[in-house]
C-alpha cells in the first residue's frame, strides 16, 4: 500500500505522530512520477528542488496539528501563476513566462503548508476537452493510455489518478474539472462562481472561470476547498461568503433529500453504460433515504451554443493582451509594429485558441453583436432561471458528468463541433454559476463514469454531504488504474 492510498486525514495523523515525514511524501511523489510520467504525461514543469527544500523545512519545524494540509504534496494546473516557477497555460506564447507573484490560491496553499510538486498539463489556455491542444505534449488517461484524460484540466486529473500527487488544483470554465475527473475516476468540484478567487488565474472567460480541487475522495476535496475559498480584495468577483468547514458536513445522513433528474441529461446521446451507472447510483441514494423525480431544464439545449459564443467572446478580449510587447513570446520575424502583433499571435497561439479568438471577435463585431453575443446572453439568463426553478422544489440535481466515457486520443481533435458537444452536460452549470461535483459512480467497458451532483448557489456543503454518503456505500473511488 502506497502512501497516497491514505486519505488527507490519515496522512495528517501519521505526520503529526512522526510515523512519516513530508520528505517521505515528496519522495513518494517523485518516485511515482519517475515510474509513470513517461506513460501519462501529466506535468509540464516539475518543482523538485524547491519541493524537497520545503519538505525539509517542514520536517524540521514540525507539522502543525491544526493544519490538515501541512506537508502534503499537490500539483497545480499550469494556468495558475506561481512565483518564480514557469507558468505557460500550455501555450508557446508563454513558454518561458516566469511570474513575479503567486495567485491567491497558491498563497493560500503556501499558508496551508502544502508542497507544490509541479505544474500540470492542460489544453492551451484551457480551451479544449481532451488536453490534446497543449503546446508541449498530450496527456494520456491512466485507465487506458490510448484515451484522453479529458480537459482542460487533464493533467490535474491524470496526476491524481496515477498517484503522482495526492491532490491537485484545476480550473473549470465549461466542465474542465468535472469532465476530466469523470474520465479519470477521481473527484472534482467546480465551486459556486465567486467562491474561490480568480486572481492569478490566466483568464479564458472571466464570467465563467472558477478554480477548484481534484482529489481521490470526497473528504480530501472538502479539506482542499476549505483552504482555497474566501473573499479576495484582488478579485472583484469573489464573494464575501463565510468560509465553511465543508468537512463537517460529511455526516452520511441524506434522509429526505429531494433529487431532480433532468430528462435532458439522460436522453439521446448519452452512452447506455453511462446512463446505467447513473441510474444505479440513484438506486444507491434511494436506499439511503433520498427520493428522486424527473425534472426539466428546458433551455439546456442552448447551453453549448451560448457557451461557445460567450466564452469565445471573452477570450477574444482577454487574450488581446498577448501581443509580444510586454511579456511572452515575441516573433523574431517582424519588421513593423503591425507585423509584431500579427506574427507573434499567429506563431504563438495554437489552432484551437486562434479558432476561438476568431469566433469571439466575429460574435462581438458590430454587425453580428445582437444576433450572436446578445442572444447568447439572453439564453444564459433562461438557463440560469431553469436551475432557479428546479431548486425551488429540489435540493440537488443529478445526472452524468459527461455523456460518454473517455474517448480515443486523436478521436475528436479534428472535429471541433463533436468535441464541443461533449460539454453539453457541464456548460449549463458554468453559465448559471452554480456549484457541481463529479464523483466516480461506476465503469462502462472498463472506463470510469462520473456522477454529477449540482447544487444551489453556495451549497457546496450539501454537495459534499450527498457525494460522501454515496461514496461510503460504494468502492468506485478506491479502484486504481493498472499502470
UniProtKB/Swiss-Prot annotation:
Q: Name one Pfam family in it.
A: Amidase
**Record's GO cellular component, any one?**
glutamyl-tRNA(Gln) amidotransferase complex
UniProt entry tagged with the keyword Cell inner membrane: no
Q: Which residues form the active site?
A: 77 (charge relay system), 152 (charge relay system), 176 (acyl-ester intermediate)
Has keyword ATP-binding? yes
GO: which molecular function terms?
Answer: ATP binding; glutaminyl-tRNA synthase (glutamine-hydrolyzing) activity
Q: Which UniProt keywords apply?
A: ATP-binding, Ligase, Nucleotide-binding, Protein biosynthesis
Which InterPro entries does the entry link to?
Amidase, Amidase_CS, Amidase_dom, AS_sf, GatA
- What EC class is this? ligase
Look up the EC number in the record and give it: 6.3.5.7
Q: Which reaction does it catalyse?
A: L-glutamyl-tRNA(Gln) + L-glutamine + ATP + H2O = L-glutaminyl-tRNA(Gln) + L-glutamate + ADP + phosphate + H(+)
Could you give a single Gene Ontology term from the biological process aspect? translation
Function, as annotated: Allows the formation of correctly charged Gln-tRNA(Gln) through the transamidation of misacylated Glu-tRNA(Gln) in organisms which lack glutaminyl-tRNA synthetase. The reaction takes place in the presence of glutamine and ATP through an activated gamma-phospho-Glu-tRNA(Gln).
Family affiliation: Belongs to the amidase family. GatA subfamily.
Oligomeric state and interaction partners are given as: Heterotrimer of A, B and C subunits.
Q: What is this protein called?
A: Glutamyl-tRNA(Gln) amidotransferase subunit A
Q: What is the lineage of its organism?
A: Bacteria, Bacillati, Bacillota, Bacilli, Bacillales
Give the encoding gene's name.
Answer: gatA
Amino acid at each position: 500500500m502506497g502512501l497516497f492510498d491514505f486519505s488527507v486525514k490519515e496522512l495528517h495523523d501519521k505526520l503529526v505522530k512522526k510515523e512519516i515525514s513530508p520528505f517521505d511524501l515528496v519522495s513518494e511523489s517523485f518516485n511515482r512520477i519517475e515510474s509513470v510520467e513517461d506513460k501519462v504525461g501529466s506535468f509540464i514543469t516539475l518543482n523538485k528542488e524547491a519541493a524537497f527544500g520545503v519538505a525539509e523545512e517542514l520536517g524540521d519545524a514540525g507539522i502543525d496539528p491544526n493544519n490538515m494540509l501541512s506537508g502534503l504534496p499537490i500539483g497545480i494546473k499550469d494556468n495558475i501563476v506561481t512565483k518564480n516557477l514557469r507558468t505557460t497555460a500550455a501555450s508557446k506564447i508563454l513558454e518561458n513566462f516566469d511570474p513575479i507573484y503567486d495567485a491567491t490560491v497558491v498563497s493560500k496553499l503556501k499558508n496551508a503548508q502544502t508542497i507544490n510538486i509541479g505544474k500540470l498539463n492542460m489544453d492551451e489556455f484551457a480551451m479544449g476537452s481532451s488536453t490534446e491542444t497543449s503546446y508541449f505534449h498530450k496527456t494520456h488517461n491512466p485507465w487506458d493510455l490510448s484515451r484522453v484524460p479529458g480537459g482542460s484540466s487533464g493533467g490535474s486529473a491524470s496526476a491524481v489518478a496515477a498517484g503522482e500527487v495526492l491532490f491537485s488544483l484545476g480550473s473549470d470554465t465549461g466542465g474542465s474539472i468535472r469532465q476530466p475527473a469523470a474520465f479519470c475516476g477521481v473527484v472534482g468540484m467546480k465551486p459556486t462562481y465567486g467562491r474561490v478567487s480568480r486572481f492569478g488565474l490566466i483568464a479564458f472567460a472571466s464570467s465563467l472561470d472558477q478554480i477548484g480541487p481534484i482529489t481521490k475522495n470526497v473528504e480530501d476535496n472538502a479539506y482542499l476547498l476549505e483552504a482555497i475559498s474566501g473573499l479576495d480584495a484582488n478579485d472583484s468577483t469573489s464573494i464575501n461568503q463565510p468560509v465553511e468547514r465543508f468537512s463537517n458536513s460529511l455526516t452520511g445522513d441524506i434522509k429526505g433529500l429531494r433529487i431532480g433528474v433532468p430528462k435532458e441529461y439522460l436522453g439521446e446521446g448519452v452512452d447506455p453504460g453511462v446512463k446505467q451507472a447513473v441510474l444505479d447510483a440513484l438506486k444507491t441514494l434511494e436506499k439511503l433515504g433520498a427520493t428522486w423525480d424527473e425534472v426539466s431544464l428546458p433551455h439546456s439545449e442552448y447551453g453549448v451554443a451560448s457557451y461557445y459564443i460567450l466564452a469565445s467572446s471573452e477570450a477574444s478580449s482577454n487574450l488581446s493582451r498577448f501581443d509580444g510587447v510586454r511579456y511572452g513570446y515575441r516573433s523574431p520575424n517582424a519588421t513593423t509594429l503591425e507585423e509584431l502583433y500579427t506574427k507573434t499571435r499567429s506563431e504563438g497561439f495554437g489552432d484551437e485558441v486562434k479558432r476561438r479568438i476568431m469566433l469571439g471577435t466575429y460574435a462581438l463585431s458590430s454587425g453580428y453583436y445582437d444576433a450572436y453575443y446578445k442572444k447568447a446572453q439572453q439564453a444564459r439568463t433562461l438557463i440560469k432561471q431553469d436551475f432557479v426553478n428546479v431548486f425551488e422544489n429540489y435540493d440537488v440535481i443529478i445526472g452524468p458528468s459527461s455523456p460518454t466515457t473517455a474517448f480515443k486520443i486523436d478521436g475528436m481533435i479534428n472535429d471541433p463541433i463533436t468535441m464541443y458537444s461533449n460539454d453539453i452536460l457541464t456548460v449549463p452549470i458554468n453559465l448559471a454559476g452554480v456549484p457541481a461535483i463529479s464523483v466516480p459512480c461506476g465503469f462502462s467497458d472498463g472506463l470510469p463514469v462520473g456522477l454529477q451532483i449540482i447544487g444551489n448557489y453556495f451549497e457546496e456543503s450539501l454537495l459534499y454531504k450527498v457525494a460522501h454518503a454515496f461514496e461510503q456505500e460504494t468502492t468506485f473511488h478506491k479502484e486504481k488504474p493498472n499502470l
